[in-house]
Amino acid sequence: MTSTRHTVLLRSSWATVNIGDVAHSPGVVRAFQRFAPEVEVILWPVRLEERERSMLRHALPDLRVVDGTLGGDGPSTPELAAAIDGADVLMHGSGADAFQSTEIDWWRRHVGRPYGYFGVTVDPLCPPTVATLPELAQMVDLLPPSYLDDDVKDRLDGADFVYCRETLTLATLRSQKITRPDLAFGPDGTFAFDHTDAVAAARLLEGLGLQPGRFACFVPRLRYSPYAKIYGTDPTREQMRRDAVNRATVTHDLAVLAAAIETWVRVSGLPAIVVPEMSYAVELAHEHLPSLVSPQTLGQVRLLDRYWPLEEATGVYAVSSLVVSMECHSPILAARHAIPTIYLRQPTETTKSQMFADLGAPDLVIELDHRAAATVVAAVTDIATDPAPAVARSRRVAANADDALRAAVRACVAGQPIGSHPPVGSDDA
């Protein structure tokens, strides 16, 4: 393939309190390294701490990172100004929304070169909607074409490409008459993240008395991330509402995760470790899970006492027997290494949860409804008894993600539509 675009400026790295968010940027960069190695991707981060910068230096030693912001006088640093001058395209990285309006608007006014979105969700319903994935799909179909704000539609319609990380976003944007960009399925960049810190992982397992291939990981979550508490800010009214929802549902939801832990220990005879995808989950696990797990099982359960780095997490996931997660990105990281995984989807979660069905694994997702405990017990029992089908499922998800990422990367670089590459789980596949 002959490239028409040689330099991509990636606006990404939204947060460091979630290893899933941390994985977005290096995942997108790895996708370009694998499928368009002749292209340079420059990372323009929103938020990076030294821990994450160190990981990037080890995982992607050739990656150029430029810092700075945009204001009335333009770029705040010479390095950002140079990156903008040299970029053929501005690319909004994978994430929960198309939220970098200031940067996109400035680029449109002052630069005029192409821009696009790579692996994003645009959820018109959540929050505050509480629904299963089938219910969300029905609601998306019922929204009027005038639902999205005009400025959002204009920004999306002005893009060169909008690659949606799941088909509910794709359906939303099509129904809202977003017609000008190459509007297509394009997976979350996290699917391409493959870096691990095997040394740190081995040290952690040794310290906890765990053996590679002989333990399972369990990831807890609240229905809403408590950002006011995480960042030490005064809560807004909406955050107060979310906190009330969290407090009312935490026992119910974590009881399902506890059922998965009980089943794993009982059926496999092997230990479990409870680990965080987000920083607040360390306290959450210690406060709630011991009382939800039986005393005879609790001796086989380790609770990680710190928020771990992404590369250590992937190193542990890569040598585990199973990852059961209430967060969306740990199953992605596990699937990359062909590890059996289950995603427990809470009813407040966004349409991003659809991504697994789009990649050919709808059964990877278990909705936290009234049947969830029984469903997860059966699923964990099956994996503990015969993991081969779940290993094959994870391999399939990773392979399908690679195919879709390859198409998205090459289309972005060539400045051409993806074409007929529908997601595996879609009706068009």
Regions found by a protein language model. Name each.
Residues 2-429:
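Active-site anion-handling motifs in enzyme catalytic cores
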